[in-house]
Amino acid sequence: MEEEIYYSVRMRASRDAPHEQGGKHISGGERLITYSGLQEAVNGLLHKGFSHSRGTPDFMQIQLESINQPIKTIRPLPVAVHQTDTAEKGQAVARKLLQKAGIPPHMIEKAYQNIAEYAEVRGAVLFDIQTGKRIDGRKERGVRVSRMDWPAHDFQKWTLEHKMPENPRIKEAHAIAAKVCAHPGIIAELCWSDDPDYITGYVAAKKLGYQRITKMKNAGDESGCRIFFTDGAIDTESCIHFLEKQPVFIQREGKI
């Protein structure tokens, strides 16, 4: 029997101009799906792009390509939730978690000093904990974790097991975190959304799993953050290739 072909479907939306020409980022998303699910996937991404609280886009690109390499299976991370009622408390929790993950305190502070600058980056930044410098060399583009998905039936079972809401934001965030933490040279990830209505963020690490923090910024704030803390011995190009190009499914057990 011929093996089914999977497709990577990716969407990005901006306002006033495409991203490369300085347009304001509105939304992005992606799926790994077979032909039978393409229409549903495209419709879902179209809806996501036009229903974002950052505004209505006037530029949208939906790109499709077939997957011509094996899809790697990655297990979901262990999960914990930290209830915080102020952004300051949430950020304090994040700092403590990063330290537990193995990031030296002075390097955590160094990264935080650059967060305003990193907020202008469309993707993630790679931060070297040995030098305290950004090493991805991608300027405002950053690194976009791509070509991953979490099959709906498996995600639903996971939410029931962990008493988590069946929320597409959680699905997307956890899928990204799981792929990021699967790379041997990445120690931890610090993230919160640029969505002004979404104040939750997380720290993810091999040692800690996915640590969700309920309030990391104030409502109405359009600045976001995504920092990958690396161990200093990383092959930068190989790491970026894995994050952007290696197709991955998040799966609780077995193979897809």
UniProtKB/Swiss-Prot annotation:
Q: Which UniProt keywords apply?
A: ATP-binding, Biotin biosynthesis, Ligase, Magnesium, Nucleotide-binding
MF terms from GO for this chain are: 6-carboxyhexanoate-CoA ligase activity; ATP binding; magnesium ion binding
Q: Has UniProt tagged this entry with the keyword Glycosyltransferase?
A: no
Query: EC number(s) on record?
Result: 6.2.1.14
Cofactor dependence is on:
Mg(2+)
Q: Catalyses which reaction?
A: heptanedioate + ATP + CoA = 6-carboxyhexanoyl-CoA + AMP + diphosphate
Q: What highest taxon heads this organism's lineage? A: Bacteria
Pathway membership:
Metabolic intermediate metabolism; pimeloyl-CoA biosynthesis; pimeloyl-CoA from pimelate: step 1/1
> A GO term (biological process) for this protein?
biotin biosynthetic process
Instruction: List, alphabetically, the NCBIfam families matched.
Output: bioW, PRK01322.1
Q: How does it assemble?
A: Homodimer.
Give the family from UniProt. Belongs to the BioW family.
Q: Which HAMAP family match?
A: BioW (MF_00668)
Protein name as it appears in the record: 6-carboxyhexanoate--CoA ligase
Native source organism of the sequence = Bacillus amyloliquefaciens (strain ATCC 23350 / DSM 7 / BCRC 11601 / CCUG 28519 / NBRC 15535 / NRRL B-14393 / F)
